[in-house]
Amino acid sequence: MFLGEYEHTVDEKGRLAIPAKFRAGLAEGLVLTRGFDQNLLLYPMPVWRELAARINALPITQPSARNLRRLMFAGASDLGLDKQGRIVLPPNLRQYATITNQAVVTGMDSFIEIWSAERWQTVLDSFADEAPALAEHVSAFGI
């Protein structure tokens, strides 16, 4: 389970430290890909395989299914942690997420999001305005 948020420096080689408490959940390998909100998504390999199977089950005749495949698979990278618990963020993914020297790693239970520090702050700032509507919306789900 991945929980919490952590700000880390991205070095000149694009290396980002993954929080120590997240590393055991990534021991079987991981996949990094584009997210839906100008962020990156980091999946443990078992979760990625399940997600990929579900995406591949979507009919290729639907434009939205093709676009989802492009978003999730075209930029994806199969990665591993180095001895210091870091991953290398590929240049194309750093550019997509506008990550330069600071990144925020956030736990999303079964996967991890990686944000530029600036973009994450914008997301946090938007919560103040959106929280009441979100609370009302999720109440329909018994949350």
Swiss-Prot record:
InterPro entries, per database record: MraZ, MraZ_C, MraZ_dom, MraZ_N, MraZ_sf, SpoVT-AbrB_dom, SpoVT-AbrB_sf
Molecular function via GO: DNA-binding transcription factor activity; transcription cis-regulatory region binding
BP term (GO), one: negative regulation of DNA-templated transcription initiation
Keywords: Cytoplasm, DNA-binding, Repeat, Transcription, Transcription regulation
Entry coiled-coil feature ranges: none
Compartment(s) where it occurs, according to its Swiss-Prot or TrEMBL record: Cytoplasm, Nucleoid
Statement: the UniProt record of this protein carries the keyword Transcription regulation: yes
Ranges where the SpoVT-AbrB domain occurs: 5-47, 76-119
Cysteine disulfide partners in this protein: none
GO CC field: cytoplasm; nucleoid
Domain of life: Bacteria
Assigned protein family: Belongs to the MraZ family.
Self-association and partners: Forms oligomers.
HAMAP family: MraZ
Name used for this protein in its record: Transcriptional regulator MraZ
UniProt gene name: mraZ
